[in-house]
Structures are given as structure tokens and as C-alpha cells.
């Protein structure tokens, strides 16, 4: 790669990639260009002109997906009743336990989200440095199970009081957050690790059309499938909110506790079927050292051994390229806190908003299921119809998808703001729903709950473009032995979004909610456009960056093989392997 100054790196666009996009519509069968045989590596001309398709998803991906489904079933099944559990009291409507009111409950809800997305850093460090993804997931599953049990016990009516339940809730949130963080940073890289890292190849369809089987599209499809399984698991909110509404909170917490055992079972039974990438020796420390040298000199060539033969670096030039690519990805992630702040409204202020409306017998937190249903319906539509249709005419690359995710998120907030305006205009309590007079204490404003449905649909569509693509981007741009760590950096942006939510929680109260929602919508809209103009040229370097992955084809195989020099000397690891 030619010498590039760091400050100009993200502005340099290789002309051949621009050329590839400009000619993406061409489907020429010009005889003057040689045609590669089926199974062969496509020529530059074929890379520019042939349609790209995905390979089949390996069976081991299904096993990892079951693990994630059960973990997300548990996570969403627990967290959806949290807002009511924290906000209300036993005699309020909707009923609760801790009595923290909307502002306090929203702040604690954001802390819960913040904690769950900070802890992936720790889980990723353990995985990439010592245990590997599989055994890290196993250990943190046990941690998460302990936290759920604490939550269940302290919610039992025979034990529960505001003091006991609050103490138990805080301890449970901390322990569950550690567990889910350790799982979350590793399970998505693990499912993508199951895909063979093979170069693009020519395939002839039954119709006679010659296409390119593109691994990057396979990875994209796997993450869409992964996200689909997440949202099938997230349908647990229907069951847990009904249990909360008709039985009690302890029943809503018991169901996820039991279902989580399914994921642990899939994890154990699939032990010998997973592809397990070897752990790198101090790879995170080496990456930070490499990045520090490059940043201190404002030039990545300063860290390349080929440019400094008199110095001994514990890496090669290709490793520097991977670190550089990972830093590009981290720059893209910098805009995500605004998006996650918007997304977080679904878990707190949307629930509180629904509680101000006429529910007609429904729990106010059950509408979150619409978000999951949206994703379950539209992920296959995008994967099978929308994306292939767009790719027939033009590349539909990561930065473009993320931009549209921001736009859908902004639309969701604006709609919520308009809806809140009409809630305030409806009686009987207008700007202070259920709080204007003792006789209207439990009487909502006269507006139907169904009008909130588009909020969840728009958030769901934004996730397809922003959240799924972010997972894919974090995986494909990370060095091979740092997949979990870079994924945790992406997840950390959610924690920053939650921190912003904590800062804004004092204004999450009536009668300020119209301004809150609309302000978030405008912020997300502006952030999306700034993101687009800042990073749209990254689209043209996708193939170049993805090609760096293929030098590690030998690391992706169905059994775990460790280089003796890379074997971590950790007795916990060996003991766990013996009994897992």
C-alpha cells in the first residue's frame, strides 16, 4: 500500500474502486474479456461487471443462533418489565414495585443499558487474550444465570419490599450486565467465524447466469439471520408482560430464567462442531502499541517493519493494515451514540408514553413486541428481495445502509413527538396525564394505544439498516484475532448513548416530552447527514479492506487448534475445558 498521511487516509479513494462502482450496472458478455471457469477467482473485469451473491450459511451458525436466541429471550424478557417495575408502586396503574417515578426509572433504565454495553469490553479482552470466544461465552452464561436468580428471588411477594427489592434489583442488574456483556461481545463474532474465509469465486446459476459468490455478502446475510434470531427471542416480551400484568413480576422473571437453560444446552452440545479461531498472543496490547506508533507520527508507515528494517516489530506489514482498517471502523462508530440514544427510547419513554394512553386491557409495555415482529417480517424481505434488487443496479454498501438507519430513527422520534402532542391535547388531564386530579389518578388521556405502533415499526426498520450493518462492519473490519474486541467497541457506543440518556433523563417528564422526542429526532437527522458526508467515500474501499481477511484462511476450520506459543497459561481455562 502506498504511503499515506493519517490525516488524509480517509480521504484517499482508489480510482479502481470508484471505477468498479461506476460500472456496477454493466452486465457485458464481451468476448474480448476471458471468462473464469466456475469455482475460479474472478478477474478485475468480472469483479466490476458480474452480480454478487452469497454462499450457503453453515449448520454451525444455527447452533450459535440458538444460543443467541435464548440469551436475547432472557434479556428482553427481563428488561421489558423493568420500566414498570421501577416506576410504579403496588397500588399504581400500571403497577410496579420500586416507586422511582418516570424520571428516576428512566435514569436507572439507561444505567442498565449503559452497564450492559460497557461490560462487553471486559468479555472481549478475556476472549481475545485468554479463553477464546467459546469458553468465554460458557463462563459468562453462568454469571448471567446467577444474576437472574437474584432478581427472581428478590421479586417474590413474600420477600419483596421497596428496600429489599431495590437492593436486589441493583445487584441483579450489575451481575446480569456482566454476564450479558461477556456473551454479547463474543457470540456475534463466533457466528461469523463459522463462515469459511474463502476468496470470491465464480458460480454459474441454473439459469446460465455467471455470478460471483462474495464472502462479504455471506457475512452480511449471516448477521441478518443472526439479528432475525435475536428478535424471535425478543418476542418473549409478549409472554413476560402478560405474566407481569396477570400474575406478578416474579413470574415474568421466572420464565427467562428457565428458558436460558436452552441456550446453555445448545452451547454444550455444539462444543465440537464450532469453528474456534486460535487466541492471539497479547494481540490487543500489540494493536494498541502499533496504533500508538502510527498516531504519534501521524503516519502508519512509521509502524511498518518494511519501512524500518533496523527496528524489530512484533508484527508484519499486513497486521498494520488490519489495525489501520480497524481504526477506520472505530471512526464510523463515533456517530452511533446518537442513534442508540434514539433506540433507547423504546425501552423507557415509549413505555411511559403508552401508559398515558387508552390500553384497552393490554399491558403498556407489550407494544415492544411490534418492534420484534417488524424485524422478523422485514429482515427476510430485505435479504431476499430488497438488497438483491438494489445490487442488480448499484452497490448497496455499509455506509449507505447506516445513513438510512439514522433517517428511520429520526422519523420514529418525530412521529413520537407528534403523537405526544396529541396525547397532551386529549383529556382529561391534558399535559399531566393521570396526575391532574385525584379522581383521574388512574385515568389515561383519551387516545388509542394503536397510534403508537408506527414508533416501533420505524425503530425496527432503522435497526435493519444501522444496527445489523454495524455488527457486520465491526466484524469485517477487525483483525482476525481481535474480532471480539472491535465488536465490543461497537457495543460500547450503545453505552455512550445510554450515558447521554442519563443526562437527558431530568427532562423525560410531562409536559416536556414533545420537545424531548422532537429534539432527539432533529439530532438524529443531522447526525445522519454529517455521517454520510464524512464517510461516504469509505464505500469505495470495501473490497480493498475485505481482501485483507483472506490471508487468514487457514485459521478457520472446524476444530480448535492452538499454536503452542499462543496457548495462554491460565489454569482456569484448562480446568474449564476439562469439565465443559
UniProtKB/Swiss-Prot annotation:
Record field: compositional bias (Basic and acidic residues): 1-30
- Glycosylated residues, per the record, are 101
Example of a GO biological process term = protein transport
Sorted alphabetically, which Pfam families does this protein's record hold? PTR2 (PF00854)
Reactions mediated catalytically: a dipeptide(out) + H(+)(out) = a dipeptide(in) + H(+)(in); an L-amino acid tripeptide(out) + H(+)(out) = an L-amino acid tripeptide(in) + H(+)(in)
Q: Where in the cell is it found?
A: Cell membrane
Protein origin, superkingdom: Eukaryota
Sample GO molecular function, one term:
transmembrane transporter activity
**Entry-linked InterPro entries:** MFS_trans_sf, POT_fam, PTR2_symporter_CS
Q: Where are the stretches annotated Disordered?
A: 1-45
Bilayer topology reads: Multi-pass membrane protein
Keywords for this entry? Cell membrane, Glycoprotein, Membrane, Peptide transport, Protein transport, Transmembrane, Transmembrane helix, Transport
Query: GO CC terms on record?
Result: plasma membrane
Q: Which Gene3D superfamilies match?
A: MFS general substrate transporter like domains
Membrane spanning stretches: 57-78, 107-127, 134-154, 163-183, 219-239, 249-269, 326-346, 370-390, 402-422, 449-469, 484-504, 513-533
Consequences of knocking out this gene? Leads to a marked reduction in the transport capabilities of di/tripeptides.
> Which family is annotated?
Belongs to the major facilitator superfamily. Proton-dependent oligopeptide transporter (POT/PTR) (TC 2.A.17) family.
Per its database record, what is this protein's job? Peptide transporter that exploits the inwardly directed proton motive force to facilitate the cellular uptake of di/tripeptides. Shows strong uptake specificity towards the dipeptides Tyr-Phe and Gly-His, when compared to PTR_A and PTR_C.
What is the protein name given in its UniProt record?
Peptide transporter PTR_B
Q: Gene encoding this chain?
A: PTR_B
